[in-house]
Amino acid sequence: MQAVQQEIAQALKVQPPFADAAALEAEVARRVAFIKDCLANARLKTLVLGISGGVDSLTAALLAQRAINELRAETGDKAYTFIAVRLPYQVQHDEHDAQACLEVIKADEVHTVDIAPAVRALAAEVAALKNGSPTLVDFVVGNVKARTRMVAQYTIAGARAGLVIGTDHAAEAVMGFFTKFGDGACDLAPLSGLVKNQVRAIARSFGAPESLVEKVPTADLEDLEPGKPDEASHGVTYAQIDAFLHGQPVDQAAFDIIVATYRKTQHKRELPFAP
C-alpha cells in the first residue's frame, strides 16, 4: 500500500474486506445497530430514503427496514416506520428496477414524488441558465434534480418526524461522486466506509437478485447522456477504486485518476469554509 492510499483510506474510514460470511453478517449487524442508535439518540421513530433502482439505495433500505423491524419487535411500538420514496423525473427508463427493489425491500410505506415540475420551474426562473451551453445547462439541471430529490425527502421527514438516510459509501466518496447538498445531504449514512463490492455483498446477503446486485451503476441525472454509467464518468472502474481503497495495486493511470479526483473534490467532503 502506498502512503497516499493509506492516507485516503484512513480519511474515509474504509473497512477491511470481509474475511468470510460471518464477518459480513457481523458488519450487517453493526450497521443495523448504528441505525437504531441514530433513531434512539434523535428520539425519533421514522426513517426516510429515496429508492433509485440501484444497489446503493437498495442496500441502505434493506438495512433500514431490518433496523425498524427489530425496533418494533424489541419495543412492541408499532410507530417505528421506514418510508421508501420513489423520486422519478417524469418517467424513469429503469423504473422496473426501482419496482423490483421495492419488492425486495418490503418497505412499511412507499411514497412517490415526481420531481419534474419543481426542477423545470426552478430552471425556468434562473436567468444564469439562459445563455449557457446545452451541455452546461444539462449538467447544472442534473444537480438540481439531485437536490430536489433531497428536498422532497426532507419534506417527508419533516412532516413525519423522521431522519433521512443517505447512500454514500467509500467508493463514491473518494471520487466525490455525489451532488453537494443533494444526495450528499442526509442525517445518517449507513454505507459509509464500505467499498462497492462490499455494498453488493451486503445486498446479496439479504437475498437481493443478481440482476439488481450487479446492475450497472448510473447517476442518470443528465438528459443528454441518459443512463451514463458511473464508471464512464470516473474514468476508472469500481473494481479499481475498491482495490485502491483496500491498498491493493492498481495500474498507474487508474491510481493517478483516483488521487487527482480525490484531491479535486475535497471540498465536497468537508464543512463549508469559514474564517
Swiss-Prot record:
EC annotation? 6.3.1.5
Report residues binding deamido-NAD(+).
R147, K180, D187, H267, K268
Under which pathway is this protein filed? Cofactor biosynthesis; NAD(+) biosynthesis; NAD(+) from deamido-NAD(+) (ammonia route): step 1/1
Query: What are the annotated GO cellular component locations?
Result: cytoplasm
- Molecular function via GO: ATP binding; glutaminase activity; metal ion binding; NAD+ synthase (glutamine-hydrolyzing) activity; NAD+ synthase activity
For the ligand (ATP), the binding residues are: G50, I51, S52, G53, G54, V55, D56, S57, T167, K196, T218
Q: Which reaction does it catalyse?
A: deamido-NAD(+) + NH4(+) + ATP = AMP + diphosphate + NAD(+) + H(+)
Query: What InterPro entries does its record include?
Result: NAD/GMP_synthase (IPR022310), NAD_synthase (IPR003694), NH(3)-dep_NAD(+)_synth (IPR022926), Rossmann-like_a/b/a_fold (IPR014729)
Q: Where does Mg(2+) bind?
A: D56, E172
Q: Does the keyword Magnesium apply?
A: yes
Q: Name one GO biological process term.
A: NAD biosynthetic process
Q: Could you tell me the keywords of this UniProt record?
A: ATP-binding, Ligase, Magnesium, Metal-binding, NAD, Nucleotide-binding
Alphabetical list of Pfam families matching this protein: NAD_synthase
Q: What class of enzyme is it?
A: ligase
- What exactly does this protein do? Catalyzes the ATP-dependent amidation of deamido-NAD to form NAD. Uses ammonia as a nitrogen source.
Q: Its family? A: Belongs to the NAD synthetase family.
Task: Give the record's subunit note.
Answer: Homodimer.
**Which NCBIfam families does UniProt cross-reference here?**
nadE, PRK00768.1
PANTHER family the UniProt entry points to: NH 3 /GLUTAMINE-DEPENDENT NAD + SYNTHETASE, NH(3)-DEPENDENT NAD(+) SYNTHETASE
Name of this chain's protein: NH(3)-dependent NAD(+) synthetase
